[in-house]
Amino acid sequence: MSPKPSKNIKLESLLEKNTLNVVFYNDSFVKAGFFAKIMSKWDAPVFYFDFDLLYSGYVTAEEISLPKNLTILSPDSDNLIENLKSVIDKISKTKSLIVLDSLNGFLNLLEGKSDAARLVNSFVMLLVSSAKDVKSCVIVGSLSKLNDENEWVLYNTGRHVLENDHMTKIQLTQSDNEIVAKIPDPDNLILEI
């Protein structure tokens, strides 16, 4: 039996509470399903940076329909800066949803650069600062786990995940083939998706 939502907390209102939101997951298919559900509820423009190409694959295979308000960007080393500039210009003028899928893929794209983690953090903060005035929302997916010190770290690399006092943290799991989203705090509040 799937866990019941706590206190009728709607995920959409929680996401809009802070401009920056980080979604922790350990199953990429659950993450793709979660993002598909969230994006289907947004009327505003959605910009999806698909670094791991899983979501794009689902769209190409027609497993997931492409909402009319969704722009999928598949950044590579040649077009990353142009994509970021274009999206920053748009999200600074119009309320939007920005999905970075995923932090792991973003870091992989910049692999080999000695300052890759600093660059990724800077790009994320640039998106967030551009989004703030028009109340846009940035969601960063992160294939992560809790380490022995109870800190979120990326799978494979063990790098620490972005931490900020002004961001919402959401943990995804699956129960009885249902996606479960919860706030990983002492109360472990279950969110209604």
What is the predicted role of each segment?
Residues 75-134:
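Phosphate-binding/switch loop-helix module in NTP-utilizing enzymes
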Residues 59, 109-111, 149-153:
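Short, well-ordered secondary-structure micro-motifs
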Residues 15-17, 66, 102-108:
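Short, basic/glycine-rich phosphate-binding loops at helix/coil junctions
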